[in-house]
From Swiss-Prot:
InterPro entries: Asp_semialdehyde_DH, Asp_semialdehyde_DH_beta, NAD(P)-bd_dom_sf, Semialdehyde_DH_NAD-bd, Semialdhyde_DH_dimer_dom. The active site is at C132, H244. The lineage of its organism: Bacteria, Pseudomonadati, Pseudomonadota, Alphaproteobacteria, Rickettsiales. Its EC number is 1.2.1.11. It catalyses: L-aspartate 4-semialdehyde + phosphate + NADP(+) = 4-phospho-L-aspartate + NADPH + H(+). Catalyzes the NADPH-dependent formation of L-aspartate-semialdehyde (L-ASA) by the reductive dephosphorylation of L-aspartyl-4-phosphate. Pathway: Amino-acid biosynthesis; L-lysine biosynthesis via DAP pathway; (S)-tetrahydrodipicolinate from L-aspartate: step 2/4; Amino-acid biosynthesis; L-methionine biosynthesis via de novo pathway; L-homoserine from L-aspartate: step 2/3; Amino-acid biosynthesis; L-threonine biosynthesis; L-threonine from L-aspartate: step 2/5. It comes from Rickettsia bellii (strain RML369-C). This is Aspartate-semialdehyde dehydrogenase. Homodimer. NADP(+) binds at T13, G14, N15, V16, N41, S42, S162, G163, N317. It is an enzyme of class 1 (oxidoreductase). It comes from the Bacteria. Belongs to the aspartate-semialdehyde dehydrogenase family.
Amino acid sequence: MTKKYNIAVIGATGNVGRETLNILAERNFPINKIYAVASNNSIGKKVSFGEQVLQISSLDDLDFEEIDIAFFSAGSEVSKKFIPIAIVKNCMVIDKSSFFRLSEDIPLIVPEANLSTLKDFAIKNIISNPNCIAIPLAVVLKPLDNEISIKRVVISTYQSVSGAGKAGMDELYDQTKSKYIFEEKSPNIFPKQIAFNLFPHIGDLNKDGYTSEESKIALELQKIIGDHLKVSVTSVRVPVFVGHSISVNIEFSSKVDAKEVEEILEDADGVVMISQTKDLAYISPTEVVGEDAVYVSRIRDDESKENAINLWITCDNLRKGAALNSVQIAEELIKTYL
């Protein structure tokens, strides 16, 4: 008989929390009891879980001793406060915030890239889910680095407003609507107007000129792939509701061309390659909404530099960029360790 688990999704009313519930139901995760958990402000709300409707329960009242696996999707402050309580009660935690990602003794996992480090979860009973851009990048870069060592990557991201939560999506919607009725909506969630606009500012601005988002992506990729990887990132917020896109220039340590890179990625787990021979041989963010794969297109040689190629990555940031990755981690946990 298959063992079943008591599961809690913390932050269940948010974009990623809701998607986590959807994916757990879609993939028939072996669940005995499911808890949809949020702050006291969400008490009385309901969320979907497959064909069920779940009542939101309060995080303050949650007894972690009854929970086998907790998915934290409520931000760093909640993780900082409640995860230490959870692990004392022997609850296994998969954290989607940035709080623990760079801790040396906590694994930062992308199953297609570094599953061998999952065993380290036992040190603290915590596994970190990477940044929504670091995940698809790791899915693509790790198999390439395994075959032909990567020297350097230059990354420009085009990140949808859902990365800033439901409030970010609402702000884009409201500003877009207001433009058609000649009203002005001041920015609240974002630093500048997001409707019909874009800006290279996600997270806080650091003293070195990079944003906190750009620093996270670089440091997380190095933790997942290796310190030998040199990374430069520019992160851009774009007026798209769901779906992140990434332009990547990859410089390899030895001779390689676009055809060889395409052949490697065609065999890579979690990747869908769009051949350059097709008409409209690229994928846009609206085409990947609801999809689990990381899509790669527009692979081409960099004619300005030897041993370098350019490519375009697109994925659903709420699924593989967040919720799906965490559920895949849980599936591997129960398959191998629990």
